[in-house]
Swiss-Prot record:
<feature type="glycosylation site" description="N-linked (GlcNAc...) asparagine">
    <location>
        <position position="101"/>
    </location>
</feature>
<feature type="binding site">
    <location>
        <position position="108"/>
    </location>
    <ligand>
        <name>RNA</name>
    </ligand>
</feature>
<feature type="disulfide bond">
    <location>
        <begin position="199"/>
        <end position="210"/>
    </location>
</feature>
<dbReference type="InterPro" id="IPR001568">
    <property type="entry name" value="RNase_T2-like"/>
</dbReference>
<feature type="disulfide bond">
    <location>
        <begin position="42"/>
        <end position="49"/>
    </location>
</feature>
<feature type="glycosylation site" description="N-linked (GlcNAc...) asparagine">
    <location>
        <position position="87"/>
    </location>
</feature>
<dbReference type="InterPro" id="IPR036430">
    <property type="entry name" value="RNase_T2-like_sf"/>
</dbReference>
<comment type="similarity">
    <text>Belongs to the RNase T2 family.</text>
</comment>
<dbReference type="Pfam" id="PF00445">
    <property type="entry name" value="Ribonuclease_T2"/>
</dbReference>
<feature type="disulfide bond">
    <location>
        <begin position="183"/>
        <end position="222"/>
    </location>
</feature>
<keyword id="KW-0378">Hydrolase</keyword>
<feature type="binding site">
    <location>
        <position position="36"/>
    </location>
    <ligand>
        <name>RNA</name>
    </ligand>
</feature>
<keyword id="KW-0732">Signal</keyword>
<feature type="disulfide bond">
    <location>
        <begin position="75"/>
        <end position="119"/>
    </location>
</feature>
<feature type="active site" description="Proton acceptor">
    <location>
        <position position="116"/>
    </location>
</feature>
<dbReference type="InterPro" id="IPR033697">
    <property type="entry name" value="Ribonuclease_T2_eukaryotic"/>
</dbReference>
<keyword id="KW-0456">Lyase</keyword>
Length: 228
């Protein structure tokens, strides 16, 4: 084989290796830290919640996401090792409860880990690091939407209020970055604030503006005034 043939073969092999590596690497641009307001989740759910809710925003999930194109999901088949959760359980049950089924918190964490957490490498190392990261963000770093709103004297009293007031309060608590909102009509056809998402860069080092919310006109978009 001549030099030209060897060069061609080397190029083909190298290209194949690059293709294999790139196909096995899942990309993401940023993280969404989504929190759900427990009463609104239950009010908008077709099946009523069995247990009383706390008037708190608690964690829905931490999701690797993309500005353009689909968000990565289920990147590995690694299950959550519930035997290792140990002394994190008490904190997680408070800040990350399964609102719809409080008898199965672990099942909720595992669902979030498999669907989203497995796609967070290298920022998220493994299942326990995923849970530890959520605890750190919500408690240590005070990325707690209820606390942020309370600091701005916005309390969950079930009244309608301008969405811009809620946004401005959250901006003050997140270095003036834009959050994302999800709203939904409850059984009384009142539109409630169901979720607030705080966005961070792909290394979870700093807040960023959330790129986009639900499309205008969708059933999850928020009007100018919402109940909270």
């Amino acid at each position: 084989m001549g030099v030209t043939g060897m060069t061609y073969m080397f190029t083909m092999v190298f290209s194949l290796i690059v293709l294999i590596l790139s196909s096995s690497t899942v990309g993401y641009d940023y993280f969404q830290f989504t929190q759900q307001y427990q009463p609104a989740v239950c009010n908008s759910n077709p099946t009523p919640c069995n247990d009383p809710t706390d008037k708190l925003f608690t964690v829905h999930g931490l999701w690797p996401s993309n500005r353009n194109g689909p968000d990565p999901e289920k990147c590995k088949t690694t299950a959550l090792n519930s035997q290792k959760i140990g002394n994190m359980t008490a904190q997680l049950e408070i800040i990350w409860p399964n609102v719809l089924n409080r008898s199965d918190h672990v099942g909720f964490w595992e669902k979030e880990w498999i669907k989203h957490g497995t796609c967070g490498y290298p920022t998220i190392k493994d299942d326990m690091h995923y849970l530890q990261t959520v605890i750190r963000m919500y408690i240590t770093q005070k990325q707690n939407v209820s606390a942020i709103l309370s600091k701005a004297a916005i309390q969950p009293n079930g009244t309608n209020r301008p969405l811009v007031d809620i946004e401005n309060a959250i901006r003050r608590g997140t270095n003036n970055t834009k959050p994302k909102f999800k709203c939904q009509k409850n059984t009384r056809t009142t539109t409630e604030l169901v979720e607030v998402t705080l966005c961070s860069d792909r290394d979870l080092k700093k807040f960023i503006n959330c790129p986009h919310g639900p499309p205008q006109g969708s059933r999850f978009s928020c009007p100018s005034s919402v109940q909270y």
